[in-house]
Amino acid sequence: AFIPRQRRQGFQFWKALGCTHDYNNSFYYSDEDVRLRWEGYDAIAQTREAQRYIRERAAGRPFTLFLSWGPPHAPYHTAPEKYRSRFRPDALAVRPNVPESDRQKAREVLAGYYAHIAALDDCLGDLLATLSEKGIAKNTILVFTSDHGDMLYSHGRQKKQQPWDESIRVPFLLRYPAALGPGGRTIDMPISTPDIMPTLLGLCGIEVPETVEGTDFSRVVKGESPAPDNAALICCPSPFGQWTRKAGGREYRGVRTERYTYVRDLDGPWLLYDNLADPYQLTNLVNRPEHARLQKQLEGLLKAKLTQTGDDFRSGWDYIRQWGYEVDDSGT
């Protein structure tokens, strides 16, 4: 829908996409309440607009640009042909936790998923090239991340919202040569989406307001402090869409530490995985006597996280009624 200028949270350049997942026929709104359409594959068209903004407006003054691509979200087989032709299903490996009965379907989906990713690889490369062209690549913070993963038939499951790693783990790449140097390194520490904004403020030398949720990890990123033993809060407030209650969807809260995943639903403890010993999460250790002490520790960590965020963990229907949402039969 059209978003008037006064509700755009300060953004001055605006081309907001309507969420259709029809990547070759998608629309957006700009400064007028007129529906416009992206030409061709929308991720490429959106990248070209971002490049145009950088060339025309960004050089010589600070800017923030937020570019949100739709792919590699389903539907999977809609990337341009030059990318789809690069991936043959029978040549692709699937994860060991994909059931044998789903392996061929998983390979077919992966071929399209990888094609979308290959297209985005080129788009990201084009953005970096434009930053270099304008002479601002070294002094620009670039973050590449995502809002969710995709089960892709691991554990016989599909799509998002679910507490397994294929769904909750997402890439987080941060590039800032002026402060971090030209080389790369890996920080083995879980973070959550609320941590991104305060960390970016820290990297910019801007004080983080006390009201901001999340943690400033800029000193960790710069190598000035060791990575703490952090835990990311994971949750599904109310199942919907592609993970309905009829399909086994449920409310849950959990924590993902560097080593463990612990999740409870409204009925109690649900999942416990040792991701170091069991990276494909094939063995659920929840409620086993020999892991009672570990489970108690993780339960305490989860309760602390919920207290910190003011989450009383009720049925999703309670929140829907409380906030006056209207949902269809799928919970959407």
Where are these regions (language model features)?
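Short, P/G- and charge-enriched loop/turn segments at secondary-structure junctions
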Residues: R157-Q162, F240-W243, G248-E251
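Low-complexity, glycine/alanine/valine/leucine- and proline-rich hydrophobic stretches
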Residues: A247-P269
